[in-house]
Amino acid sequence: YDRKPTNGAGFVCHGQRFVGGGEAVVDLLAAYSTTVLDALELKHGPSHMEVKLAPGSGAPCLVEVGARCHGGEGYWMSVADECCGRNQVCAALDAYVDAAAYAKLPPRPPAALAARGRLKYLLFHKGGTLADIDAAVVDQITALPSYRGHEFFVAAGAAVVPTKDCFTWGGVVKLNGADEAQVDRDYAFLADVSARDPGLWVIA
């Protein structure tokens, strides 16, 4: 998660990044997560977990765990598929109905990812009535090299408030591609047009 203080709230999620198995933090998180699941006696099925790394020590600290797949209506599934050729939902189905296929799955994503996936949430930095979503900016978004799809959670006429949680996002954009620097640039562009006034959002 890309979380940071925003609009007076201390822990606002701006986006998500798909992490490859070659990153050093993966071993730490995998070991810690396994310990948590064992302690909770969650032995069957998928789980979703949020873990923070303590400043300074880098020690993992549990925020939450759910006995389910990662949420977000599965919007991330195609991002995972492009990054490593599989996703948690399909792996869970294999566990239930195809033991042979499940047994072939590696314990974590490959070290070398085929693509560098991101989800970028579209934040509001101003409250009021959403007069419009600028079509020209939407065209710029869909033309981004790493663009893979988007969804708006609001429409013209809606009352909006500055984003402080997942219930006040304006939308989400899927990004993916082999060029990580390009994905980072596109991610930064989305942050900019969401914050600009006027930008993506035309708020009265």
Go through the PLM ranges and name each one.
Residues 2-21, 79:
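Glycine-rich phosphate-binding loop of ATP-grasp-fold ATP-dependent ligases
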Residues 15-31, 181, 190-193:
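Active-site nucleotide/adenylate-binding loops and adjacent lid/helix of ATP-dependent enzymes
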Residues 27-49, 66-132:
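Active-site "cap" helix and flanking loop/linker of ATP-utilizing ligase/carboxylase catalytic domains
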Residues 61-64:
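Protein kinase-like catalytic core scaffold
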Residues 43-45, 59, 167:
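Residue-level preference for beta-strand/loop junctions
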Residues 93-204:
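Peripheral (often C-terminal) accessory segments that flank ATP-dependent C-N-forming ligase machineries
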Residues 6-11, 72-76, 143, 195-198:
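A short, polar/proline- and glycine-enriched secondary-structure boundary/capping micro-motif
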